[in-house]
Amino acid sequence: MQPTYKNKKFIDDIDFLNKTVILRVDFNVPIKNGEISSIKRIIASLKTIKKIVNNGGKLVILSHLGRIKSKEDLPKKSLRIVAEKLAEILGQEIKFIPENRGPKVENAISQLEKGEILVLENTRFQDLNNKAESKNDAELGRYWASLGDVFINDAFGTLHRAHGSNVGIATYIKESAIGYLVKEELDALSKLIFSPQRPFYAIIGGAKISDKIGIISTLLEKADKVLIGGGMAYTFKKALGYKIGLSIYEDDKLELAASLVKKYPDKLILALDAALAPEFADLEPLYNQENPLEIPDHLEGMDIGPLTIELFKDHLKDGKTILWNGTLGVAEFKNFARGTKEVAKIIANLKECYSIIGGGDSIAAIEAEGLSNSFSHISTGGGASISFIENGDLIGLGPIQEKD
């Protein structure tokens, strides 16, 4: 089976000379105390930006930054700081307009010379107008499309959503294609969905089954084993009749959890023991030495325990393809990051294994351990990655032009 994105136009198929190019990127960067704390998303877009500029395009960049709920959000969510950082990284002048529609925008675009870059204001500023951006308002999409000759979508992180600045523009513009980052992400994920080397193992963490039920169900069909850790493991354990103490669980997902264990008894590998604490805090871990599989009433599970680390190590040792999404404990607490760190090391040390990691907290954990280069691919899009694994396609790809 061939993924549908292979039929879509790619940035290398486009002649950019003297054309005004609308580029949708994902500059949704973390900002702390008025400073950008990670430039990874900016760096990820550079190959596409340079391709357009170096080939004589007049570049207009669109991106969102956070969510906009009221006018009070606007000053904190301006893309000005990102435009300034992009100028610093590229070593060239970047024009910025604190608007994204209207005469000032049109005038600035009309004055662009080939090789120049203009960054428009946060697309979600339009959400103050009846959620026009997030609800893919047709008039807004048509307007943004009217500003350029070509549309390139390189915002992988938003491809699972139909917004005015992705689906809207692509629907109404004459020429469109996907950028380098989008193709790189889709190529990496396609390897494990459509043609994984086996054994193919998945590790799924995070707090809630409800957030990941789609991907868990899909992976139980596609993978050879699915290893479950994180907070969601306690829902599975309670469903099987184990005592879980004060641990979080989803009451309305107990039946579902039990049915998955019954349907996939050999594929679904659940955490055995846990590192425990009397409250949700970064305390010295406790362990139930008498009965590691159960959690006393006054304690809650905060991380996978040593038995589970060894269990996971044993299952993963012959893996040829591994997907990991979600931390296996409360990794932001130093005392409960051990499980996530140990599993990261296990995967990093596997030979001839194609490994993909996604999810912000999981990625932060491997970066903290200096293991980023030991993974085959680090995905930039959490929700988009999950949606593509579940469906083999993404809504944002739909209106992108087909290859000739």
UniProtKB/Swiss-Prot annotation:
EC assignment: 2.7.2.3
Keyword presence, Kinase: yes
Coiled coil spans: none
Binding site for substrate: D26, F27, N28, R41, H64, L65, G66, R67, R124, R161
Alphabetically ordered keywords of this record: ATP-binding, Cytoplasm, Glycolysis, Kinase, Nucleotide-binding, Transferase
GO biological process, one term: gluconeogenesis
Superkingdom of source: Bacteria
PROSITE patterns registered for this protein in UniProt: PGLYCERATE_KINASE (PS00111)
Binding site for ATP: K212, G301, E332, G359, G360, D361, S362
Catalytic reactions of this protein: (2R)-3-phosphoglycerate + ATP = (2R)-3-phospho-glyceroyl phosphate + ADP
SUPFAM superfamilies: Phosphoglycerate kinase
Listed name of the protein: Phosphoglycerate kinase
Organism whose genome encodes this protein: Mesomycoplasma hyopneumoniae (strain 232) (Mycoplasma hyopneumoniae)
GN (gene name): pgk
